[in-house]
Amino acid sequence: MPLHRLCTARTPLPALFIIPVFSALLLAACATPAPLAEGPAQTTPDVLKADYERSIRSAAVKEPAFSGPLRAIPAGRKMVTVGTFTEWGAPPNPLARDVWVSLPDQLRELCRGKPDAVLALQQILGLPPQPAPSKPENRFVVVTFEVPRDAMFRPCPGGTDVSAAQCTAGDLSAGLDHETTTFLLNQIWTSYRIGFTQAGGDGGPQPRWGYPFTGMGWSYNWDPAASSPVGISEYVVRKGAPATVLEISTPEAFCGAA
């Protein structure tokens, strides 16, 4: 989710509930998934919605090959430059909530040259197809900022170490703390769903999107034209971390940069 959706921790659940339920959900919801059906690219709202919902179903059933190579952040690095795709502008310093991020160079490599930069970013990052921001005064941007490495973790139940070369699709890591376990359980519970709605700004129903959360440290690229659904390595920066904004770019400028 994510460059990414912004997530807030939910009310902590009792530990005796979290571990068995989380384990069951991971096994039920946990081979690199097959790409979505190939064919001529279409971008009508109904086609995009169908493509996106298929990606959620695919991401929810994990296989051993989900455990693929990830971008590792060496333990000796103190600060890391990250980016987030958002309609809410620059994040506050310190961060007011957990923020999903990726490495700007890896994201730019996949979106460069795409005719629709916003849609390309949404597909690469595993975000729902949203042609316009939720409020008229908002604008989609990519914010690049610097954070301490120690404030980052991989959203991976098999291990959250950002220096690891991959996540595992087997058992839960014994090193997960209560806060991270609750965060990951919330991701699974709120990601694997379709067909839900919520009241929009005009009082009418709007989609309450799920997400193709892989739980394996990489985003699900739901672009049907992509050779693989493996997107980019994704990370989460914890609430309260200091964040120094380096640049705010339009999606078009970010994806078109050399």
Regions found by a protein language model. Give the residues of each.
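Residue-level signal for mature regions of secreted extracellular proteins and peptides
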Residues: 23-24, 248
